[in-house]
Amino acid sequence: MERELLRLSETPLHLEKTWESGGVPVLTAEVTLPCCGGKSRRARRFDRYYRQYARAYLKYCEAELLPRAAETMHTALERSAPWSCARAALAYRVTLVRGDILSLYTEGREEHLPPRLTLRRAETWDRRTGFLLPLTAFFPPKTAVKKRLVRAARETAREQMETGTAAYYPNYGALLRRAFSSRSFYLADDGLHWFYPMYSVAPAAEGIVDFSLPYGEAGPFLLSEGER
């Protein structure tokens, strides 16, 4: 009997929390993450992964953002300056569901809490097994994946700099190699995307820097069931 593939529930995992300082709300957090809701071991593993992620994000908000939010509020009150309650929101976007593949990324955004920051994380799942797939799964064996993607990123960045469509730090070539992470990728209809954190290779105005390669025989490619 063929195993049923993981399917996302129409009701995602949703959590909200508010922190106060001196009885005044200074930080709110809202978390919306994917959920399967099934009873199989694969579904439970998937849901446990994102429950742990949600808890870790709320701990990050309390440990890192709350002190800054409280300080911002007290400073504004002392100066009689305008002030807004800080807000943190973590949400997800499904980028590809095709065959055995489920790919998505999450983004955490922080508002009214300088410096401006967006955090992205991505996961690509095998819907048959309920396990995460590594970046190397989408390239032929022994492919120098990092070298190939960094080279492609450098070429794209150079073209963008020449046409004035994007800005990078002067040493972007070295930074693209140094800040590369094999976990920072997702799949979409147009190919494989990999990305860099804010401020790591380009000014804040560029946000999260995203590069892509179309699917091809030399990789990246989508594996068929027989190739798993």
Feature map (PLM): residue ranges:
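Compositionally biased intrinsically disordered regions enriched in Thr/Gly
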Residues: 1-228
